[in-house]
């Protein structure tokens, strides 16, 4: 597995264009990973997922969605790894320990373990428990266990978060060192630090001294983290990370950030800080939002986005989707998710193309307009 | 001119089973055929493309639901349901009457029509035969159904006879109201409850109206199966051979096989998709309730001989692990269950054409009831058409 990256200097900001290679598969960056819960992309059966081009060949599965069901015993009994179990046979998975689905219940984390929240409640997970679980999952990538705090956590608690996360990282590394079966699973170090610049930098510098494959930037999807803080903290953090390793940010497109500005802000994040991967899924269209519940779509027989090449826009109208949504028909979610993922993947492809062709400014103008 | 052409492809030399080709405006339909039910212009989370991939040639839409929401005006603007949901093959719509009687507390039947309280306002609305046809004309299905006076199949006494006569009067009003004879086929419905005389009289009257197809209604409402099959058997014996016969609301595997032996061509039922929503997979030996813990470590597919996407991709253990939390689980089970229904109908048809249908029925029943504990009604029904289990 390797990562090739080219830094593109654009009037002082450093964009990064890269390719993460594993086996015959490549994830181009900047790019997005597609998130799944318990192995399913919400709403989508695999045949519908297949209608999307350029789906990254690695699926992101958060620990919380699999620790209970299927869980360790079932996966061990199955014996062929998580990717195969979830029907993703030709491709691979990335397992994250952090669960950005809701605000972290960080006060329940302890020195020796973090708390993972599932449907039936809390499960305490130590770095060894976690590593054992990852071992039966056989992912291509996994993230180190982390104690993520929101931006408004106290200084003391934020420091503790950085210390614990480094300690967890070392234990994950130690376990990986001792177990050959994890050799093909690359470890990403979680970088913490809440809303504090000093702690962000300490976490980045310390993590950078460890033998890890890449870095994940945690806590940026927190409700307490506003866009301004994100843009202040990110460059100060990433300047302490080695250039040649990939960076992944979780949940940067949180629905708490105004979505319209989000799309243009997101390009700034990419431009100024050169994060390599972002990860999000949303029920709404990416660039400007259509609320398909609104009455005005009742008789609108045009596609969601004219010219969109996705399966949905080629086959169905706004009026039909409006009808499905207001009647709470499950197909409404299926169609919206399909279109949105297509747009999201396409968005990142445009970013990469514009970087390759030196058309970055033109692309930005398009999104800012 | 007719919007339907009917060809009898093969008849079983033992039983009354038959394989037909029913050519409709949008798509030819090979029978015996099961029609899945897409209530509101959608099949429970599946795209029209997925239904096409499974191989369905005809699906059912509900007039009551489509007529209230999105409504006939929008249906007209959308150029009909086919375009609205982007389904290029055939559609059948029911009359809407049955849905009202079964879904709404306040439905009241008069000679005029079915009176009911709008679920969206305080208004009292009236579904007349004319209105039902008008709505169905705007939906534009290949086959539309007359409004009939539906009584519970367990009802007895003069109400059953009244309903039968009213159904015939309503049929005449539907025929007069029907505007799209050239592109939509109006089917009549045999009523008469569980009374053989009434059924006979009803068939006699409606056959005179010479509609392109005929449905057998008023069954599948929890009546005694021994009476059920006798009514079906009587109707198929009385009905003309050169028209499709549609048994409404029937969709259990055993019922499909037995009723096909009795000479039924078309079926519809919400069962495969409804049972999928409750986590049940249909298999040739019965059903699997995948929520049960016995499947949590079962790494086989639902049915290793099933060609569906679900069986090719997932194990029972995986489905068991997502079934309580992910709607995708219910889409996956719907895909499997609908594939099962489709495959079953294809086997029935193939065996009728090859004249191996009696043996097929025996094999099917043996697999479904390996201990030989066959339901008596099925044994009797099949014996009546010379298939001895
Ligand atoms: Zn689209
Ligand atoms: Zn299957």
UniProtKB/Swiss-Prot annotation, chain A:
Keyword tags: Cytoplasm, Metal-binding, tRNA processing, Zinc
Cellular component, GO, one term: cytoplasm
One annotated GO biological process: tRNA-guanine transglycosylation
Chief localization: cytoplasm
One Pfam short name: TGT
GO molecular function, one term: metal ion binding
Cofactor mode of binding and number, as noted: Binds 1 zinc ion per subunit.
Binding site for Zn(2+): 308, 310, 313, 339
Region of interest: Disordered: 263-282
Subcellular location: Cytoplasm
Co-factor requirement: Zn(2+)
NCBIfam families found in the cross-reference section: tgt_general
Its biological purpose: Non-catalytic subunit of the queuine tRNA-ribosyltransferase (TGT) that catalyzes the base-exchange of a guanine (G) residue with queuine (Q) at position 34 (anticodon wobble position) in tRNAs with GU(N) anticodons (tRNA-Asp, -Asn, -His and -Tyr), resulting in the hypermodified nucleoside queuosine (7-(((4,5-cis-dihydroxy-2-cyclopenten-1-yl)amino)methyl)-7-deazaguanosine).
Subunit structure, interactors included: Heterodimer of a catalytic subunit and an accessory subunit.
Family stated for the protein in its record: Belongs to the queuine tRNA-ribosyltransferase family. QTRT2 subfamily.
Protein name: Queuine tRNA-ribosyltransferase accessory subunit 2
Lineage: Eukaryota, Metazoa, Placozoa, Uniplacotomia, Trichoplacea
């Amino acid at each position: 597995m390797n990562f090739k990256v080219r830094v593109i200097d654009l009037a002082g900001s450093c964009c990064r264009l890269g390719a993460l290679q594993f086996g015959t598969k490549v994830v181009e960056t900047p790019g997005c990973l597609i998130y799944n819960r318990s192995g399913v992309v919400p709403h989508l059966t695999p045949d519908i997922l297949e209608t999307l081009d350029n789906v990254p060949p690695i699926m992101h599965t958060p620990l919380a969605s699999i620790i209970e069901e299927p869980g360790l015993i079932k996966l061990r009994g199955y014996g062929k790894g998580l990717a195969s179990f979830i029907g993703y046979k030709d491709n691979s998975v990335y397992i994250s320990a952090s669960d950005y689905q809701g605000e972290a219940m960080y006060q329940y984390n302890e020195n020796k373990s973090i708390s993972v929240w599932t449907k039936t409640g809390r499960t305490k997970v130590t770095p060894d428990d976690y590593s054992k679980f990852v071992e039966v999952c056989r992912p291509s990538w996994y993230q180190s266990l982390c104690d993520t705090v929101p931006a408004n956590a106290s200084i003391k608690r934020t420091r503790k978060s950085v210390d614990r996360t480094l300690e967890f990282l070392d234990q994950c590394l130690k376990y990986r060192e001792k177990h050959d079966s994890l050799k093909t699973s690359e470890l990403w170090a979680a970088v913490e630090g809440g809303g504090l610049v000093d702690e962000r930098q300490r976490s980045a510098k310390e993590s950078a001294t460890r033998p890890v494959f890449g870095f994940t930037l945690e806590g940026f999807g927190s409700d307490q983290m506003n866009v301004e803080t994100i843009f202040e903290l990110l460059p100060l953090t990433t300047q302490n990370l080695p250039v040649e390793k990939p960076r992944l940010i979780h949940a940067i497109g949180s629905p708490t950030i105004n979505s319209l500005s989000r799309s243009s802000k997101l390009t700034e994040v990419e431009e100024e800080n050169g994060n390599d991967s972002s990860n999000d899924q949303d029920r709404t269209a990416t660039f400007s939002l259509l609320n398909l519940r609104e009455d005005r779509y009742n008789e609108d027989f045009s596609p969601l986005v004219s010219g969109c090449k996705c399966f949905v826009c080629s086959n169905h109208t706004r009026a039909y989707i409006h009808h499905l949504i207001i009647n709470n028909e499950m197909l409404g979610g299926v169609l919206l998710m399909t279109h949105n993922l297509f747009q999201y993947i396409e968005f990142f492809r445009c970013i990469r193309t514009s970087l390759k062709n030196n058309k970055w400014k033109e692309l930005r103008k398009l999104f800012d307009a | 001119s007719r919007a339907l052409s009917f060809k009898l492809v093969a008849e079983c030399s033992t039983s009354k089973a038959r394989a037909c080709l029913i050519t409709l405006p949008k798509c030819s339909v090979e029978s015996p055929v099961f029609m899945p039910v897409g209530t509101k212009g959608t099949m429970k989370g599946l795209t029209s493309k997925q239904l096409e991939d499974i191989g369905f040639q005809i699906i059912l839409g509900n007039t009551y639901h489509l007529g209230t929401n999105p409504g006939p005006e929008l249906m007209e603007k959308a150029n009909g349901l086919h375009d609205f949901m982007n389904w290029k093959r055939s559609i059948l719509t029911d009359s809407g009457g049955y849905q009202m009687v079964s879904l709404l507390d306040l439905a009241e039947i008069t000679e005029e029509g079915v009176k009911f309280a709008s679920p969206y306002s305080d208004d009292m609305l009236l579904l007349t035969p004319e209105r039902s046809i008008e709505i169905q004309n705007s939906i534009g299905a290949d086959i539309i159904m007359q409004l009939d006076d539906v009584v519970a199949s367990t009802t007895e006494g003069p109400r059953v006879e009244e309903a039968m006569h009213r159904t015939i009067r309503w049929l005449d009003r539907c025929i007069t109201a029907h505007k799209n004879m050239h592109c939509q086929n109006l089917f009549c419905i045999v009523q008469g409850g569980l009374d053989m005389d009434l059924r006979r009289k009803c068939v006699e009257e409606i056959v005179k109206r010479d509609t392109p197809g005929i449905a057998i209604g008023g069954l599948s409402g929890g009546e005694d199966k021994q009476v059920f099959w006798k009514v079906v058997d009587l109707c198929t014996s009385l009905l003309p051979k050169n028209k499709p016969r549609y048994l409404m609301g029937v969709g259990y595997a055993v019922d499909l096989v037995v009723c096909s032996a009795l000479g039924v061509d078309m079926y519809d039922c919400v069962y495969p998709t409804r049972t999928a929503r409750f986590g049940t997979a249909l298999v040739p030996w019965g059903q699997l309730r995948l929520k049960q813990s016995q499947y949590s470590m079962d790494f086989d597919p639902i049915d290793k001989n099933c060609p569906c996407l679900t069986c090719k991709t997932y194990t029972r253990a995986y489905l068991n692990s997502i079934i309580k939390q992910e709607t995708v689980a219910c889409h996956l089970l719907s895909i499997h269950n609908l594939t099962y229904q489709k495959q079953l109908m294809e086997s029935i048809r193939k065996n009728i054409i090859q004249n191996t249908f009696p043996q097929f029925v025996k094999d099917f029943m043996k697999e479904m009831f390996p201990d030989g504990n066959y339901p008596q009604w099925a044994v009797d029904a099949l014996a009546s058409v010379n298939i001895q289990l």
